[in-house]
């Protein structure tokens, strides 16, 4: 259910873009993200920090897109969010000395510190790479290509990277954890 609520605004954005334009889609994205946030709160009585940060960025950049009638803002949103996620991961590892990935998953999984560090760094690089890819697609290719890339390309990349991370985690789990 949680994944559906997270994915719903993206579907709304895509459908509204295909039926109308980038401005209707941006407004619908802001509204759908707000609805998803409220529904998440009502169902789980908590909202993850990543979800809240995403909502704030969607609200800011979506509103700026509508107020200034300029799609550059909604295009930059993707890169800004990915950069913030990458920075959070890197700061947690370098400054706070405990990878954010470990803080998020460490209660369920026991892995060597080196594995947590590599996984954390890999996700930081992944987010930076996605942010850079977004810049290229958003500003050098047609808007319709960017929308497809944002909805399908980045979603597929994230799913593949999540799967690869799962394989990496599994290979580094103890035999006891693998069988429990």
UniProtKB/Swiss-Prot annotation:
Protein name per its UniProtKB record: Inner membrane-spanning protein YciB
The record's InterPro entries line, in alphabetical order, gives: YciB
What HAMAP family does the annotation carry? YciB
Biological role stated in the UniProt entry? Plays a role in cell envelope biogenesis, maintenance of cell envelope integrity and membrane homeostasis.
Identify the Pfam families for this entry. IspA (PF04279)
Species name for this entry?
Edwardsiella ictaluri (strain 93-146)
Q: Does the keyword Transmembrane apply?
A: yes
Q: Where found, per UniProt? A: Cell inner membrane
> Would you name any one GO CC term?
plasma membrane
**Gene responsible for this protein:** yciB
The record lists the membrane-crossing segments as 22-42, 50-70, 76-96, 121-141, 149-169
């Amino acid at each position: 259910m949680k994944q559906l609520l997270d994915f719903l605004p993206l579907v709304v954005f895509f459908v509204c873009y295909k039926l109308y334009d980038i401005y209707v889609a941006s407004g619908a994205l802001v509204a759908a993200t707000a609805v998803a946030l409220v529904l998440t709160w009502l169902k789980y009585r908590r909202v993850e920090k990543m979800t809240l940060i995403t909502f704030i960025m969607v609200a800011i950049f979506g509103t700026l897109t509508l107020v200034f009638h300029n799609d550059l803002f909604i295009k930059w949103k993707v890169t800004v969010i990915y950069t913030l996620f990458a920075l959070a991961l890197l700061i947690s590892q370098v400054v706070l000395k405990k990878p954010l990935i470990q803080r998020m998953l460490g209660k369920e999984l026991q892995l060597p510190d080196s594995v947590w560090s590599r996984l954390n760094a890999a996700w930081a690089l992944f987010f930076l790479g996605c942010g850079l890819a977004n810049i290229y697609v958003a500003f050098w290719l047609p808007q319709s290509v960017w929308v497809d890339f944002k909805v399908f390309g980045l979603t597929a990349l994230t799913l593949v990277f999540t799967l690869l991370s799962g394989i990496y985690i599994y290979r580094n789990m103890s035999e006891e954890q693998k069988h429990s």
